[in-house]
Amino acid sequence: MSQFFYIHPDNPQQRLINQAVEIVRKGGVIVYPTDSGYALGCKIEDKNAMERICRIRQLPDGHNFTLMCRDLSELSTYSFVDNVAFRLMKNNTPGNYTFILKGTKEVPRRLLQEKRKTIGMRVPSNPIAQALLEALGEPMLSTSLMLPGSEFTESDPEEIKDRLEKQVDLIIHGGYLGQKPTTVIDLTDDTPVVVREGVGDVKPFL
């Protein structure tokens, strides 16, 4: 049976944030709010927790996970960022974007896209997500909470509780969220490529 925390969406209670981070550090899988709906998260190097997430979402081998980072400095530790990419991201983070970048040796090999050695990176603006990452002190392995058979990210924490309370360690209720996905931008080459248009404005990358 999972725990269920009500955390204020604008002013997260630090006591609950610390408890949530402790669950992650001990190998737990959590449901938490982001800019684009709820997500599943775990510690970056915890293979068992990652496999639990794969079972919950019925993900295929080689699924492209995302690393949630608190800021660009942390993002730059886990991915190769040139000057052009850095300027673009600096002007558009935190926010509703996922950036595809080449991963550094800090990223476990099993998380990198097999052929291109890339990884999705995000700097969320959601206050709860930011507070979690600040307290954790490292990126969190993450994927959108899109349950099998659904085309949309889950947005209702009460429904999530009904469906997942026996499969995850913690569900954070951070309000009812939108369902539109992030905009995905590939920054591995000199020219940015819009892979998916979502909530984030694509104009800065065209």
UniProtKB/Swiss-Prot annotation:
Family membership noted in the UniProt record? Belongs to the SUA5 family.
Its protein name is Uncharacterized protein YciO
Database matches in SUPFAM superfamilies? YrdC/RibB (SSF55821)
Gene name, per UniProt, is yciO
What's a Pfam family this protein contains? Sua5_yciO_yrdC
Q: Which organism is it from?
A: Escherichia coli (strain K12)
**Boundaries of every YrdC-like domain copy:** 14-200
Question: GO CC annotations?
Answer: cytosol
Q: Which PANTHER family match?
A: DHBP SYNTHASE RIBB-LIKE ALPHA/BETA DOMAIN-CONTAINING PROTEIN, THREONYLCARBAMOYL-AMP SYNTHASE
